[in-house]
């Protein structure tokens, strides 16, 4: 390749990479998504909701054995595209109990727009609830599960959705009675751009 052409193209590539952070999202829109933006202290309950019309696209967490084998959490949200429209209803799902493995998707074809959690000293674990929002009568399809986050118990966790066409619908978790920690697999789905008749897919 001609070096002159390379020097002309390099600033353009660098600018595009800086604008999108390599993730398919404008990185600057992740507000407070850093090490000092935790939504909880260790052993503390929390409730986190995305602003209206936004859904969770990133989850970050750090583990502390000495602080009750607990984690601090942080989330990032992004607005949904105009093709989905506005949320027509939002709700808290059923509680997933501490000390147990669980699998849960938002009911009623909802998308994850928040998390709520409470810590239990007796089991050194948390119970969890999803905050879900439904968008008209849109239905999920082409669903898949992410790899495990974190890769090993006790490690830091940093899950970012790389594809704007996929939305978080839920998760499945394992629980280690020895490590007192969880591994998460997030359920990601596309959503139809038209209404459908299925009430819960």
From Swiss-Prot:
Residues 1-18 form the signal peptide. It comes from the Eukaryota. GO terms for biological process: cell adhesion; collagen fibril organization; negative regulation of cell population proliferation. The modification Pyrrolidone carboxylic acid is found at residue 19. It is found in: Secreted, Extracellular space, Extracellular matrix. Sulfated on tyrosine residue(s). InterPro entries: Dermatopontin. It comes from Mus musculus (Mouse). Its main location: secreted. This is Dermatopontin. Residues 19-186 are annotated as: 2 X 53-55 AA tandem repeats. Belongs to the dermatopontin family. Induction: Induced by cell quiescence. Disruption phenotype: Mice have reduced skin elasticity, a decrease in skin-thickness, and lower collagen content in the skin. Disulfide bonds join 50-77, 90-132, 106-133, 139-196, 143-189.
